[in-house]
């Protein structure tokens, strides 16, 4: 038993230069666990509350001193003396202290920092890697990476509507080889863009953000990059999209500003289905607005047997909302962002519910990240089989890939890489 002796938090900066919460959980043995909390750019309205100070004279109102103070006083007073390995008891106690449905009193950023730091402290106390602590007996699986190599929407200052254009290297036996593939495609894409006289600056998540005339133009330059790198789109590399449709949905209409087009839900489902018919797209995230359940159902009925349809803003890592999706046949996958729900226990519950229902799960970063690599261990421990942690630049993104390389090395022959088997519910022919 590792008894919690001290909990302390501080304000640090994330990858976008905004404050976030970092917490240390120190055990009576002197062992410490440390965790930092990410922050999103495009956020679902039902996400747990990220407590900000609102003081316009400091960090443009985005300071987190209130959340830090809540950790150092209310949470520390309640949790010191508890067993750090009792993850659910710790998380339940913090939820009781908060007393709201959305963690708006103490802040999900306060709760999550402590929740993750406690897990790290216990793993360190036991001399285990975090993924082994979370799942001591296995099985473990290295995830297929969704590599966001071209950014649009809220993640970039350009004219592309779709937020993320990703590559998924599936035709490989090891994660390290899949990572090499994605890296080579990333560098090839830079050359493709340079040859066309396009900008090669990067967005929040490390992907390129060129000013392209349409969403299809983005797909075309990626296909050219895959070919130049020596890989085969639709064979050993597939494409994935994060439409982030809530960002361009208003009054029942989906508006693609870059193309000057407007769609009803049914018509936008047809638009996405047409893209999937003409391009090797295996996964679409947030293809409909978070509140458009009718549209989501139409999209699922149209594509759900052959394309992974991931709910991010739709499900917000919340088991209550996920259960509705499962019951109504909406989507077939959930994006997992632990700051959407605010504790490790609730995150694990969402993954378990998804897998029990035959849904896939994709463990994800946020656009505002830190050097914290917890999501890499979480993906391996839960056999999520997929991870989304940005492009192949910016150390806040690459840190997660590097942690997965270390885990692969530690697992040795047990380091399973699923490839296309990560998508068991999809019909391919």
Swiss-Prot record:
It catalyses: (2R)-2-phosphoglycerate = phosphoenolpyruvate + H2O. The lineage of its organism: Bacteria, Pseudomonadati, Pseudomonadota, Gammaproteobacteria, Chromatiales. It comes from Alkalilimnicola ehrlichii (strain ATCC BAA-1101 / DSM 17681 / MLHE-1). Catalyzes the reversible conversion of 2-phosphoglycerate (2-PG) into phosphoenolpyruvate (PEP). It is essential for the degradation of carbohydrates via glycolysis. It is an enzyme of class 4 (lyase). Its main location: cytoplasm. Its cofactor is Mg(2+). GO terms for cellular component: cell surface; extracellular region; phosphopyruvate hydratase complex. One of its GO terms (biological process) is glycolytic process. Its EC number is 4.2.1.11. This is Enolase. InterPro entries: Enolase (IPR000941), Enolase-like_C_sf (IPR036849), Enolase-like_N (IPR029017), Enolase_C (IPR020810), Enolase_CS (IPR020809), Enolase_N (IPR020811). Mg(2+) binds at residues 242, 285, 312.
């Amino acid at each position: 038993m590792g008894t919690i002796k001290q909990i302390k938090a501080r304000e640090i900066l994330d990858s976008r230069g905004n404050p976030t919460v970092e917490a240390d959980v120190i055990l009576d043995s002197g062992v410490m666990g440390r965790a930092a909390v990410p922050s999103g750019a495009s956020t679902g309205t039902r996400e747990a509350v990220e407590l900000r100070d609102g003081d316009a004279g400091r960090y443009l109102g985005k300071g987190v001193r209130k959340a830090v103070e809540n950790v150092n006083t209310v949470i520390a007073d309640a949790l010191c003396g508890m067993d750090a390995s009792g993850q659910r008891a710790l998380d339940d106690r913090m939820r009781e202290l908060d007393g709201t449905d959305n963690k708006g009193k103490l802040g999900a950023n306060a709760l999550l920092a402590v929740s993750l730091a406690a897990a790290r402290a216990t793993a360190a106390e036991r001399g285990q890697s975090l993924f082994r602590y979370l799942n001591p007996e296995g099985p473990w699986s290295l995830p297929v990476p969704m590599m966001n190599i071209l950014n649009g929407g809220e993640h970039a200052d350009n004219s592309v509507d779709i937020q993320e254009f990703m590559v998924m290297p599936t035709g490989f036996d090891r994660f390290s080889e899949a990572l090499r593939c994605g890296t080579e495609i990333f560098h090839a894409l830079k050359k493709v863009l340079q040859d066309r006289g396009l900008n090669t600056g990067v967005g929040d998540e490390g992907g390129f953000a060129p000013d392209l005339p349409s969403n299809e133009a983005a797909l075309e330059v990626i296909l050219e990059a895959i070919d130049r790198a020596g890989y085969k789109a639709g064979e050993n590399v597939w494409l994935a999209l994060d439409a982030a449709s809530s960002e361009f949905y208003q009054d029942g209409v989906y508006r693609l500003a870059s193309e000057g087009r407007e769609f009803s839900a049914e018509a936008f489902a047809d638009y996405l289905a047409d893209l999937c018919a003409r391009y090797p797209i295996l996964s679409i995230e947030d293809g409909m607005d978070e509140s458009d359940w009718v549209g989501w159902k139409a999209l699922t009925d149209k594509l759900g047997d052959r394309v992974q349809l991931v709910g991010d803003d739709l499900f917000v890592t919340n088991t209550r909302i996920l259960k509705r999706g499962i019951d109504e046949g909406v989507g077939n996958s959930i994006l997992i962002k632990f700051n959407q729900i605010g504790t490790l226990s609730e995150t694990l519950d969402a993954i378990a519910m998804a897998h029990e229902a035959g849904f896939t799960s994709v463990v994800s970063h946020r656009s505002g990240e830190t050097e914290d690599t917890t999501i890499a261990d979480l993906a391996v421990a839960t056999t999520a089989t997929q991870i989304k942690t940005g492009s192949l630049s910016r150390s806040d993104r690459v840190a997660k890939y590097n942690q997965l390389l270390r885990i692969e090395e530690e697992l040795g022959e047990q380091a399973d890489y699923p490839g296309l088997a990560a998508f068991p519910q999809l019909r391919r022919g």
